[in-house]
Amino acid sequence: MIETTDSLRDCLAPAKLNLFLHITGRRPDGYHTLQTVFQLLDWGDTLHFTRRDDGLITRRTEIADVPPEHDLTVRAATLLKTHTGSPEGVDIEIDKRLPMGAGLGGGSSNAATTLLALNRLWKLNLPRLELQALALKLGADVPFFVFGKNAFAQGVGEALDVVQLPPRHFLVVTPRVHVPTAAIFSEKALTRDSKPLTITDFPAELSCNTEWPESFGRNDMQQVVVGKYAEVAQVLRWFENVAPARMSGSGASVFAAFRSKAEAEAVQAKLPAEWNSAVAASLDQHPLFTFAS
């Protein structure tokens, strides 16, 4: 990251993985309650912010099918400006790397990076908990990225506890299909009654078991997505004799964990050419974690 008085450049908006995802119920308002462990990665979109004196908030990058007014970075900046009454404006540029509709939290992470970066650039000095409350207005995953640590999440994803996870390298494979999260959550076949866990149920498994992630929990959305999207099923089948693999979030991305970058890259080299893939290392905290207290 490069910081000047009027700009913040090369701000990573890290991807996340759901190491498991259990859906434990559905609230009267239609939102689902869940339990998951979020893992940060050192791979994601890169954002650039330049302060404006005229108070305008603009996105300088064209993104197909995402008009600026619907972009979570613009919405996050607008929400923060309205909440604080700040006279400042900003130009936002996005180097897009994460595929959309992939279960990697790309839009949510961009929103959180915007909140954290502007908290610094606009000299707002809002505490982290206040930013997390704003983040929840933008989406269920956004508070996690503002929280900024690998976490056990509950509720709709806003109740967060830090978890210590081992260093890993992940191979993330994304077939060329977009999976709409809302549509999967509305599927009648979706399991909504997983038995709730406590935080003490899983850390030793996640840290020590060499067969992880297959050895602990599951992704309750995976079976539904596999039944609707043959491309996701194909990726999971490919991994069956290679390494334990699991879908992240509502898909379409599938991931496998490895002890070293070399192991992950050796498997990546064997993938079919038509699949997007990346090898990424685990992160312990968000790169902009210190921009809130």
Swiss-Prot record:
Entry keyword set: ATP-binding, Isoprene biosynthesis, Kinase, Nucleotide-binding, Transferase
One Pfam assignment: GHMP_kinases_N
Pathway(s) served: Isoprenoid biosynthesis; isopentenyl diphosphate biosynthesis via DXP pathway; isopentenyl diphosphate from 1-deoxy-D-xylulose 5-phosphate: step 3/6
Protein encoded by which gene: ispE
UniProt GO molecular function: 4-(cytidine 5'-diphospho)-2-C-methyl-D-erythritol kinase activity; ATP binding
Biological processes, Gene Ontology terms: isopentenyl diphosphate biosynthetic process, methylerythritol 4-phosphate pathway; terpenoid biosynthetic process
Catalysed reactions listed for this entry: 4-CDP-2-C-methyl-D-erythritol + ATP = 4-CDP-2-C-methyl-D-erythritol 2-phosphate + ADP + H(+)
Xref: PANTHER family: 4-DIPHOSPHOCYTIDYL-2-C-METHYL-D-ERYTHRITOL KINASE, CHLOROPLASTIC (PTHR43527:SF2)
Functional description taken from the UniProt entry: Catalyzes the phosphorylation of the position 2 hydroxy group of 4-diphosphocytidyl-2C-methyl-D-erythritol.
Organism of origin: Paraburkholderia xenovorans (strain LB400)
Family of this protein: Belongs to the GHMP kinase family. IspE subfamily.
InterPro entries associated with the record: GHMP_kinase_C_dom, GHMP_kinase_C_sf, GHMP_kinase_N_dom, IspE, Ribosomal_Su5_D2-typ_SF, Ribsml_uS5_D2-typ_fold_subgr
Amino acids binding ATP: P99, M100, G101, A102, G103, L104, G105, G106, G107, S108, S109
Name recorded for this polypeptide: 4-diphosphocytidyl-2-C-methyl-D-erythritol kinase
EC number: 2.7.1.148
Catalytic center residues: K16, D141
EC supergroup of this enzyme: transferase
